Swiss-Prot record:
One of its GO terms (biological process) is translation. Pfam families: Ribosomal_L23. This is Large ribosomal subunit protein uL23c. GO terms for molecular function: rRNA binding; structural constituent of ribosome. It comes from the Eukaryota. GO terms for cellular component: chloroplast; ribonucleoprotein complex; ribosome. Signal peptide: none annotated. It is found in: Plastid, Chloroplast. Belongs to the universal ribosomal protein uL23 family. InterPro entries: Nucleotide-bd_a/b_plait_sf (IPR012677), Ribosomal_uL23-like (IPR013025), Ribosomal_uL23/eL15/eS24_sf (IPR012678). The lineage of its organism: Eukaryota, Viridiplantae, Streptophyta, Mesostigmatophyceae, Mesostigmatales. It comes from Mesostigma viride. HAMAP family: Ribosomal_uL23_B. Part of the 50S ribosomal subunit.
Length: 92
């Protein structure tokens, strides 16, 4: 699980999607929708309705004179069944 699903994303859009019971994660670029759905359902004990994936374009990175690119990643938006939820942040 840790190798495929790296971490949850908490951006403005991701927090807005939480109201629609949609959660955003960064995952391994080689992972497909079927394995992501199975991992999320098993690990968090929820029912996944849909999995939407996209691979944002790589950004250029410059360190001194050398120029390269940031690492590739895949972002996933997972829609859960109504009533199910994932606890991302600890309650204070």
């Amino acid at each position: 699980m840790i190798d495929i699903v790296k971490y949850p994303v908490l951006t403005e859009k991701a927090t807005r999607l939480l109201e629609n019971n949609q959660y955003t994660f960064d995952v391994d670029p080689k992972a497909n929708k079927i394995t992501i759905k199975a991992l999320i359902e098993d690990f968090f004990n929820v029912k996944v309705l849909s999995v939407n994936t996209h691979r944002p374009p790589r950004k250029k990175r410059r360190i001194g004179r050398s120029e390269g690119y940031r690492p590739n990643y895949k972002r996933v938006i997972v829609t859960l069944k109504t009533g199910d939820s994932i606890k991302l942040l600890p309650e204070t």
